[in-house]
Amino acid sequence: MPWTILLFASGSLAIPAPSISLVPPYPSSHEDPIYISCTAPGDILGANFTLFRGGEVVQLLQAPSDRPDVTFNVTGGGSGGGGEAAGGNFCCQYGVMGEHSQPQLSDFSQQVQVSFPVPTWILALSLSLAGAVLFSGLVAITVLVRKAKAKNLQKQRERESCWAQINFTNTDMSFDNSLFAISTKMTQEDSVATLDSGPRKRPTSASSSPEPPEFSTFRACQ
């Protein structure tokens, strides 16, 4: 039994939801139109279809009297509008005349998502930018590491220089202390030697000694 007869008989508001699908040619860019087919059950002919995108009405179409489906050509943001097609989530709904010529609306169809492939140049540009950012990051990290190493090396050299200066100062102090000890010891030894010598008799020269007696030999006078 056709749905129209059932609707007139029962006045029910629960009529089947339509099916929705993309049909070729499929869009490859934002400038390409989007073709969406919306189909009611096979025995419902000449229904009025409404296409929604994100809860907003995009287009209204009536199916031919001998067909249960329509094909929407989305080329803009509104019904029949021109311009750039936009992707998103689409769904559709249809309506028929019920009892007492009251319009009866179906449930909403499933959603179909329309997206566009990323252009090659955008992908190449994104990869180039990502590579440039990565390279810049690596260069910055390398510079920071080298600066840190140079700073640590400079600190190590300063510490080594400080220790060398301290050791040199200690060596000089030890040498000065040794010289001072030797000088003090020599001074003490000289003082002791002076005290031990005391008054001594000066040696007399040979000229001051008493002259030895003169001896003479006399021969007898004959």
Curated annotation (Swiss-Prot):
- Which keywords does the record carry? Glycoprotein, Membrane, Signal, Transmembrane, Transmembrane helix
Topology, Extracellular side: 22-120
Q: Which residues form a coiled coil?
A: none
Q: Which residues are glycosylated?
A: 48
Alphabetized InterPro entries for the sequence: C19orf38_Ig, HIDE1
Signal peptide residues are 1-21
Q: Which domain of life is it from?
A: Eukaryota
The residues on the Cytoplasmic side of the membrane are 142-222
> A Pfam family this protein belongs to?
Ig_C19orf38
Localization: Membrane
Residue ranges for the region (Disordered) are 190-222
Locate the transmembrane regions by residue number. 121-141
Main location per the UniProt record: membrane
Descriptive protein name:
Protein HIDE1
